[in-house]
Amino acid sequence: KAVLAFDKLDTKFPVIMKTLRGSKGVGVLFVESEKSLDSIVQLIYKQDEDTDLLLQEYIPTDYDVRVLVLGGKVLATMKRPVIEGDFRSNVSQGSKPEKIKLTELEIEESLKAAKAVNGVWTAVDFIPSKNREKEPPFVIEVNSSPGTEGMEEASGQNISKEIIEFFADKKNWVKV
């Protein structure tokens, strides 16, 4: 199954494999070959055959960007440099967050990604394109229960306060 999924990606190794239940960079794997892909999938399914897996094209980068979206607006952003000796950029894994200003295109694409999952409170993670002004970023993940670790440090904002104030306002409540 994994090899069939890889073939549909229309890419080359290495690829990124993610378990859909992971967080903070746990369950994210760098897969270098078909043999490795097969072995990793066998190991994961031996532990839990109901584990959902996602394969993504590997895009080399020095950093990714996390965008917190709240109520259809960008709340805060941070640049997450790739950890030395690793391919991940999660703050929980050791990345040191930095401030970043998004382009209009990056804002537009982040809001579009959040809207695609009907997210009121989401984080959109992306790898910026080479030409940030003219080419859309590569969205790599949209989180419906986002971590905010490092965001206050990078943005200088009181994220928790802003989230509480948003949801305390009844006009922002969503009917279910």
PLM regions: where:
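Short, structured loop/turn "capping" segments at alpha-beta junctions
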Residues: F13-M17, Q47-L54, V120, V174
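Phosphate-binding site of ATP-dependent enzymes
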Residues: K24-A113, V117
